[in-house]
């Protein structure tokens, strides 16, 4: 009894502090790299920097179970342009380096599953860990293990994670405020070690002026069963200050709890932004119109959210969240990389309402007009959500989003080999279903899910310099845009003093800043004027030529109609074509793709499109938001490239081509200063 009380006292004294509220400045431990050749260059007109703020490495439980053994440090090396080889022997390298990067492993069970895989560790000796033992060693890494890993990920992981510890663990959890201390399959030391590894990698790879490495992680949560709708966020820290332990769903599973925690640690010196992703798969949860407890949204909610969550991922590997054909039936380009199922629930439909950013923009304007604030005044970024430590943005060099999807066969884009199809067909029907065996067009494929993934996306930030501080402030003010993986350069401005400007003016950008506002900002229309918009896009030198520029207008009609509305305007066409004044559409420029070799039209499209535009339907009494969408000429989708290399016909149900694109953050035009 005395020993028990002594142990209890030690636990109380050593573990009573909430580590999520203990902030440390890690710059004091790790030397910041500076060298003469990396002198920081500042551009008052701002330069565009491309990067990825959503990357999973071997420390994420799901990435590890899918074969990822690549460390956070190696992930940053990849972002800098170095060659990295994954556990399946796939050689991964970017065509050109990125400017910034954040490893964002799941805070949930970060660094713990590889302990389950080690039979010599304390956790590896627990009952139920045997199927995980040596899972990423030797012969266990072959393609045939894919179906086994799916079961481990979707079933065994949850059962093991739910096992409770004894009384001592429960007492420790009470005093530490970390309920995971009461979980048998959790080890706080392993968890903190992985978190520290992520911080150390970011600090050591951060090179101000040359390459920015952000400290970050993913807050992973969802609604209770049976809905189980996910609303995950990545948390990106401004500098070197971060908590001793990441705040996870076990600390609070609702986003209001996350935002409140962000407020608390900001007061302690650790500023951060949360960026939600896969709203398309959230079953209406990311942009719901109420608190998590059912109360209606009010201005306090809107302020809390916008203070902590000014951005959203508009595209990534698991689909695009701009809009859905059901929400935008008049938008011919709405059906782009749509993934209709819930995150992690491949057979359950995700309700488009409350799941897409265009509708959210309109709902935010409606809430604002009702005096409840605008919780959806959001800017856009793209990201990869790679679980391979290394994102694959290039359609012609796509190597999957996880280590085990490194082969075309495992991605489902080419038929299974005869031997593998025979093996899977010999399994019981339920095992065949779990393994994803699918017979289509007289051929056998490994499921449908892999082909629904996209080679997407990237975040673009307009910033004075390539440093944490400058990039973070740009993200805070929403001067950002997202792309589907290409590096289109895109400017978007609005102002009332652009009448004397022309698209060919010298110092056009400086004048646009001086006389108006950039993407992500508010334009207050005190004099009821019709603003002019400046849109300027340049093609990715490694991508296809540009086909058209579009402005999407979103507004709320607060008259007797009380309805949200949207309209797509083409504002600039390639190849000397003109926008039809009635349909507001460019004629087809005739660009095509040769599906025998994926070559594209060389004489169609533009290297650059630049124009001024005014809304022909402008009504000064209605608040509206406007954002730009840039479309490239069509190119082969990655799945078509896979089939072409394998010498087989592409799958009939998978799109053969895509139009890569970019989306600017919106500009909000308000009739008064209440914005």
Language-model regions: role of each:
Residues 128-174, 576-589, 597:
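Low-complexity, serine/threonine/proline-enriched polar segments
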Residues 257:
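Acidic, metal/ion-coordinating pockets
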Residues 181, 185-192, 204-207, 220-225, ...:
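A conserved hydrophobic secondary-structure block that centers on an alpha-helix together
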Residues 107-108, 145-212:
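Long, well-ordered early-domain segments
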Residues 13-15:
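C-terminal motif of bacterial Sec signal peptides marking the signal peptidase cleavage site
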Residues 238-239, 557:
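Short acidic-glycine loop/turn motifs at beta-strand connectors
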Residues 1-7:
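Sec-dependent signal peptide recognition
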Residues 17-72, 76-135, 184-187, 198-209, ...:
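C-terminal functional module detector
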């Amino acid at each position: 009894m005395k020993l028990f009380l002594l142990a209890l006292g030690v636990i109380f004294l050593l573990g009573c502090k909430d580590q999520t509220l203990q902030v440390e400045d890690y710059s004091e431990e790790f030397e910041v790299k500076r060298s003469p050749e990396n002198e920081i260059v500042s551009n008052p007109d701002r330069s565009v920097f491309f990067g990825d703020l959503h990357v999973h490495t071997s420390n994420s439980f799901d990435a590890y179970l899918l074969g990822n053994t690549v460390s956070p440090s190696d992930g940053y090396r990849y972002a800098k342009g170095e060659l990295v080889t994954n556990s399946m022997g796939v050689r991964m390298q970017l065509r050109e380096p990125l400017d910034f990067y954040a490893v964002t492993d799941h805070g949930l069970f970060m660094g713990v599953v590889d302990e389950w895989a080690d039979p010599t560790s304390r956790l590896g000796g627990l009952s139920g860990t045997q199927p995980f033992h040596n899972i990423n060693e030797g012969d266990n890494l072959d393609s045939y293990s894919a179906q086994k890993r799916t079961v481990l990920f979707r079933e065994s992981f949850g059962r093991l994670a739910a096992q409770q510890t004894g009384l001592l663990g429960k007492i420790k959890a009470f005093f530490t405020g970390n309920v995971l201390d009461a979980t048998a399959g959790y080890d706080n030391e392993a968890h903190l070690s992985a978190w520290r590894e992520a911080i150390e990698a970011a600090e050591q790879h951060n090179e101000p002026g040359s390459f920015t490495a952000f400290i970050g992680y993913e807050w992973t949560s969802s609604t209770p069963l049976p809905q189980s709708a996910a609303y995950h966020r990545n948390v990106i820290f401004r500098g070197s200050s971060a908590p001793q332990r990441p705040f996870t769903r076990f600390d609070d599973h609702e986003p209001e709890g996350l935002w409140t925690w962000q407020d608390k640690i900001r007061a302690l010196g650790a500023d951060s932004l949360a960026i939600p992703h896969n709203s398309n798969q959230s079953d209406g949860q990311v942009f719901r119109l109420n608190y998590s407890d059912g109360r209606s949204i009010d201005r306090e909610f809107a302020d809390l959210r916008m203070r902590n969550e000014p951005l959203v991922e508009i595209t990534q590997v698991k689909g695009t969240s701009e809009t859905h054909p059901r929400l935008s039936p008049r938008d011919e380009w709405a059906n782009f990389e749509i993934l209709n199922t819930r995150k992690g629930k491949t057979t359950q439909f995700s309700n488009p309402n409350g799941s897409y950013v265009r509708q959210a923009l309109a709902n935010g304007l409606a809430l604002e007009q009702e005096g409840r604030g605008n919780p959806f005044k959001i800017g856009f970024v793209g990201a990869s959500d790679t679980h391979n430590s290394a994102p694959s943005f290039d359609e012609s060099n796509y190597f999957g989003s996880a280590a085990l999807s490194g082969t075309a066969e495992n991605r489902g884009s080419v038929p299974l080999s005869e031997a593998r199809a025979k093996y899977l067909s010999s399994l019981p029907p339920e095992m065949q279903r779990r393994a994803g065996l699918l017979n289509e067009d007289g051929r056998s494929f490994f499921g449908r899910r892999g082909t629904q993934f996209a080679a997407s996306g990237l975040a673009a930030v307009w910033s004075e310099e390539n440093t944490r501080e400058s990039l973070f402030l740009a993200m805070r003010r929403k001067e950002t845009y997202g792309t589907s993986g290409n590096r289109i350069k895109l400017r978007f401005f609005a102002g009332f003093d652009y009448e004397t400007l022309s698209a060919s003016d010298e110092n056009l950008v400086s004048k646009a800043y001086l006389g108006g506002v950039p993407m992500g900002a508010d334009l207050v229309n005190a004099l009821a004027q019709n603003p002019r918009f400046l849109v300027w896009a340049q093609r990715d030198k490694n991508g296809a030529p540009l086909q058209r520029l579009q402005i999407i207008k979103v507004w709320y009609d607060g008259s007797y109609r009380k309805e949200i509305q949207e309209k797509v305007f083409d504002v600039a066409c390639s190849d000397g074509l003109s926008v039809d004044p009635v349909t507001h559409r460019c004629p087809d420029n005739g660009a095509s793709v040769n599906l025998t070799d994926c070559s594209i039209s060389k004489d169609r499209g533009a290297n650059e499109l630049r124009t001024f535009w005014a809304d022909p339907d402008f009504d000064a009494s209605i608040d509206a938001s406007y954002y730009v969408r840039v479309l490239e000429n069509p190119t082969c989708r990655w799945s078509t490239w896979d089939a072409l290399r394998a010498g087989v016909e592409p799958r009939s149900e998978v799109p053969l081509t895509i139009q890569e694109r970019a989306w600017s953050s919106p500009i909000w035009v308000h009739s008064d200063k209440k914005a």
